[in-house]
């Protein structure tokens, strides 16, 4: 029963999303997950921008990219953990 490999931030404010993302990434790293999916939705893009800004300064993140076809496209971000 480790951490889930995805988190859904849709409908949250950018502050709520950042806090939830921080807690999720902490659990993912402790559980030694190597890849996780962050669902932020398409909407206005505010949550996506906040997620990407947070990921850029998060030490445990090796890389991240928007989802591809079949992964959720630009409504999700795929994160590789180091």
Residue spans of the language-model regions?
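Long, charged, low-complexity intrinsically disordered regions
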Residues: 1-82
């Amino acid at each position: 029963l480790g951490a889930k490999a995805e988190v859904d931030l849709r409908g949250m404010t950018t502050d709520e999303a950042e806090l939830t993302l921080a807690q999720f990434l902490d659990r993912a790293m402790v559980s030694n997950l190597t890849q996780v999916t962050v669902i932020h939705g398409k909407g206005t893009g505010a949550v996506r921008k906040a997620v990407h800004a947070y990921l850029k300064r998060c030490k445990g993140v090796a890389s991240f990219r928007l989802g591809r076809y079949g992964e959720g496209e630009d409504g999700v971000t795929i994160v590789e953990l180091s």
